[in-house]
Design a protein with these regions (language model features):
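Hydrophobic alpha-helical transmembrane segments
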Residues: 1-58, 149-154, 168-221
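Hydrophobic, membrane-facing alpha-helical anchors
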Residues: 9-22, 83-87, 112-122
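Secretory targeting signals
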Residues: 51-55, 61-67, 98-165
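Hydrophobic alpha-helical transmembrane segments of multi-pass membrane transport proteins
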Residues: 57-83
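Transmembrane alpha-helical segments that form the membrane-embedded catalytic/substrate-channel core
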Residues: 73-77, 145-150, 215
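Helix-loop-helix units of permease transmembrane domains in multi-pass membrane transporters
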Residues: 75-102
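Membrane-interface module
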Residues: 94, 121, 128-129, 213-221
Length: 221
């Protein structure tokens, strides 16, 4: 009697129209982003509750919110699916790019909601430019995503995301400690080095996303 030969299962093929986003969205670690969202909502609601929000307080809160939301999104790139999928028709860079879009888009939506609430509490006529502040948030988000995309190439689990958070917070702290002449976080909207700082942020903003694009490439085997 001949023993049936054991065949290696063929690579999983994703048929046309096979939904990838729902299982990918379920696989993302949303807990850090949910925790930061609750923190942002609580802090914005409780700061000077029942009174108008001072412009400098609102600016500080939005910067803290943008930094923490970027840190939380780093956890979305920890890909537990990679060990289970084996050979698959869906490249790693596609899965990781979708993770960036899903979690990053959610973080931006949360930040915009927080900005709208903060804006509604400011006194009439207060300068609070959404475009400039969104550039700051995009820089924090891009650095966190790029660092996380790099870290998960060398480590697995939450320790990779934590390494990315350390990199992001370290870079933010380094820019805060710069001399006043090159300060990148002016304390008052529209005054001092505000325009120059945001011209710098705008010019540098493509760099972390270019870094992210390189880090999302498929791993060489």
């Amino acid at each position: 009697m001949t023993t049936p030969s054991r065949r290696t299962p063929p690579p999983r093929q994703v048929a046309h129209g096979d939904p990838l986003i729902p299982p990918l969205a379920r696989a993302i670690d949303w807990a850090p982003l949910a925790l930061v969202t609750a923190f942002v909502a609580g802090v914005l609601s409780l700061t000077n509750a029942g009174e108008p929000l001072a412009g400098q307080d609102a600016l500080l809160l939005m910067r803290v919110s943008g930094t923490l939301l970027g840190s939380a999104v780093a956890f979305a790139l920890v890909d537990a699916m990679s060990a289970d999928l084996g050979a698959t028709a869906v490249p790693r860079w596609v899965r990781q790019s979708l993770r960036c879009l899903l979690a990053g888009g959610t973080a931006v939506a949360v930040w915009l909601g927080a900005f709208s609430y903060a804006l509604s509490r400011l006194p009439d006529g207060t300068l609070f430019p959404v475009g400039d502040l969104l550039i700051e948030m995009a820089a924090c988000l891009g650095i966190a995503l790029a660092a996380a995309a790099t870290a998960v190439r060398f480590a697995s689990g939450r320790q990779a995301a934590m390494a990315a958070v350390v990199v992001q917070l370290g870079l933010v702290l380094a820019t805060i400690l710069l001399p006043e002449q090159v300060r990148l976080w002016p304390p008052t909207c529209g005054f001092g080095y505000w325009d120059q700082a945001h011209q710098f942020w705008l010019a540098m903003s493509p760099l972390p996303y270019a870094w992210l694009g390189l880090a999302l490439r498929d791993l060489r085997r």
